[in-house]
């Protein structure tokens, strides 16, 4: 009870605090997805979206946030609440984007942390799952474009080059060197990258 309020709030010390979309990693970490392609190539709702793993994960998080003293869901303040708590040493784990280590934790002179992938659903899950996060960019081609095939080819080319050339460079030159300075976190980034999933 770091705030001496005699009630649980985001100013206390916890194992885990999250808010908003920062909890999405748990959904994807369970192996679930929102949509997928069917046998005809059409995008449909994934059966995992309402599956048992998602229900169990939500129940586990609700127990953590509302029925224990180990976690809290911050309803006000968004990401800075858990980012600052982590940087002040009041938080054991947080889920967030990689850039937080550079722009939020570094100014707090907090560098005693490790990167780990989102936990597996259970010990039987074969691999980790990491989503790119909700702030990723989606591209569309206007219906009145003069040459939709060429526009599609252009976007596909840049997506391919980004995946094969840009993404490895970002991981090797930024995430594994600029954002962390220990070999264990660098290895963890290799695990994260090897298990990235896209929800389409």
What positions do the PLM features span?
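Loop/turn elements at helix/coil->beta-strand transitions in domains of secreted/extracellular proteins
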Residues: 9-15, 67-70, 88-92, 108-114, ...
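Glycine-centered hinge/linker elements that transmit conformational signals in sensory
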Residues: 20, 25-76
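Non-transmembrane alpha-helical segments in soluble domains
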Residues: 58-62, 83, 151-159
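Sec-exported extracytoplasmic/periplasmic mature domains
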Residues: 62-69, 156-163, 197
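Short helices/loops that flank or line small-molecule/ion binding pockets
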Residues: 79-94
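Beta->alpha turn/N-cap motifs
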Residues: 96-101
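Extracytoplasmic/periplasmic substrate-recognition and gating elements
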Residues: 106-177
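C-terminal capping/gating helix-and-loop segments adjacent to ligand/active sites or protein-protein/ligand interfaces
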Residues: 184-200
């Amino acid at each position: 009870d770091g705030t001496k309020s005699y009630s649980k709030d985001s100013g206390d010390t916890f194992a885990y605090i999250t808010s908003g979309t920062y909890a999405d990693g748990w959904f994807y970490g369970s192996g679930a997805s929102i949509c997928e392609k069917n046998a005809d190539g059409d995008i449909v709702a994934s059966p995992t979206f309402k599956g048992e793993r998602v229900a169990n994960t939500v129940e586990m998080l609700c127990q953590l946030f509302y029925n224990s003293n180990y976690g809290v869901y911050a309803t006000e303040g968004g990401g800075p609440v858990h980012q600052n708590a982590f940087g002040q040493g009041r938080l054991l784990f947080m889920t967030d984007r990689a850039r937080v280590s550079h722009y939020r934790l570094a100014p707090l002179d907090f560098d005693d942390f490790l990167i780990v992938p989102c936990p597996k659903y259970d010990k039987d899950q074969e691999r980790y799952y990491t989503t790119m996060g909700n702030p990723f960019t989606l591209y569309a081609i206007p219906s009145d474009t003069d040459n939709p095939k060429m526009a599609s080819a252009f976007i596909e080319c840049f997506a391919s080059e980004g995946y094969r050339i840009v993404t490895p460079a970002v991981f090797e030159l930024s995430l594994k060197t600029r954002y962390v300075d220990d070999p264990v976190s660098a290895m963890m980034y290799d695990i994260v990258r090897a298990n990235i999933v896209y929800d389409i």
